[in-house]
Curated annotation (Swiss-Prot):
GO biological process: translation
Function according to Swiss-Prot or TrEMBL: This is one of the proteins that bind and probably mediate the attachment of the 5S RNA into the large ribosomal subunit, where it forms part of the central protuberance.
Gene: rplR
Pfam family, one: Ribosomal_L18p
Keyword set, alphabetical order: Ribonucleoprotein, Ribosomal protein, RNA-binding, rRNA-binding
GO cellular component: cytosolic large ribosomal subunit
One term of GO molecular function: 5S rRNA binding
Protein name, as recorded: Large ribosomal subunit protein uL18
Top-rank taxon: Bacteria
């Protein structure tokens, strides 16, 4: 992929991200679950937008999780444990500009299977 094409893809994702973020907001009882996907790993956090604080976060690098569907399922299990420890069972899913497909969809479905209502 050329640098020009890559820049365009990133710009389109940022545009989608801003459009989505204008419509959703999380609070302490129902935080925003934001996921970031790199080529190698995944990161996820629960954010209270009112106080601008991170309530829970899981780093895929520290767990040795790769950015594939199996890794997304494992990350969702760990993240669900972290949310349940904070007594959070409802959240708003922020796909962070990524298409709801593949790894992102696998993460969301696994989070629902582990008892977090999105």
């Amino acid at each position: 992929m050329t640098a020009k094409v890559l820049k365009r893809k990133i710009a389109l994702r940022i545009k989608r991200k801003r459009r989505i973020r204008g419509k959703i907001s999380g609070v302490a009882t129902c935080p925003r679950v934001s996921i970031f996907k790199s080529n190698r790993t995944l990161y996820v956090q629960a954010i209270d937008d009112v106080t601008a604080t991170t309530l829970a976060a899981v780093d895929g690098r520290k767990l040795g999780i790769k950015a594939n569907k199996e890794g997304a399922v494992t990350l969702a299990k760990e993240f669900a444990k972290a949310l349940k420890a904070k007594k959070i069972d409802v959240a708003i899913f922020d796909r962070n500009g990524y298409l709801y497909h593949g790894v992102i969809a696998a993460f969301a479905e696994a989070l629902r299977e582990n008892g977090i209502k999105l």
